[in-house]
């Protein structure tokens, strides 16, 4: 099937339950449009539907309003960082949102410190940028298996 294009930031999406019928939904949270575009290209093989946010604060609003199956977030962003964002997702009163897998990425040279902050916040996986397509797909396949067909 053709990948579903992401909705432009600020547009009104059609709401559908995460993990229900249709493509799995991924929220991409990164202040770099080019990184968000690259991630979509890498993940096209899974036919995800993409939601995007340019900041952690915007990502929280989107995640609270829209059901998602996976969150990919950068660590370094203006305002709230990716670890604090992940911590707020984990603390959500919405039980489905609080359990959504979170993959945090960073280009920070202090990988051990950033990874520790992410793990303390409850991330599901961590990857250092630049990330290859194969590496990203392996991580995504590990934390978000393909949905099983109904029996």
Model-flagged regions — what are they?
Residues 105-106:
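Hydrophobic/aromatic residues positioned on beta-strands within the core alpha/beta folds
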Residues 66-72:
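Active-site beta3 strand of CheY-like receiver
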Residues 131-140:
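C-terminal output helix
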Residues 141-151:
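The C-terminal output helix
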Residues 84, 109-127, 138:
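Alpha4 helix (beta4-alpha4-beta5 surface) of REC/receiver domains from two-component response regulators
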Residues 37-45:
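Charged docking surfaces used in two-component/phosphorelay signaling
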Residues 77:
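Receiver (REC) domain active-site loop signature in two-component systems and cognate sites
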């Amino acid at each position: 099937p053709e990948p579903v294009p992401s909705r432009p930031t600020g547009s009104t999406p059609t709401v559908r339950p995460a993990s229900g019928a249709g493509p799995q939904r991924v929220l991409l949270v990164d202040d770099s449009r080019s990184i968000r575009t690259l991630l979509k290209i890498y993940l096209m093989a899974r036919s995800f539907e993409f939601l995007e946010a340019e900041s952690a604060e915007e990502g929280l609003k989107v995640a609270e309003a829209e059901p998602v199956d996976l969150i990919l977030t950068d660590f370094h962003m203006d305002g709230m960082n990716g670890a604090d964002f992940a911590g707020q997702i984990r603390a959500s009163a919405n039980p489905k949102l609080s359990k959504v897998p979170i993959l945090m990425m960073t280009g920070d040279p202090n990988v051990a410190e950033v990874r520790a902050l992410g793990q303390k916040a409850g991330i599901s996986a961590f990857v250092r940028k630049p990330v290859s397509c194969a590496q990203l797909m392996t991580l995504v396949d590990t934390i978000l298996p393909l949905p099983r067909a109904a029996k």
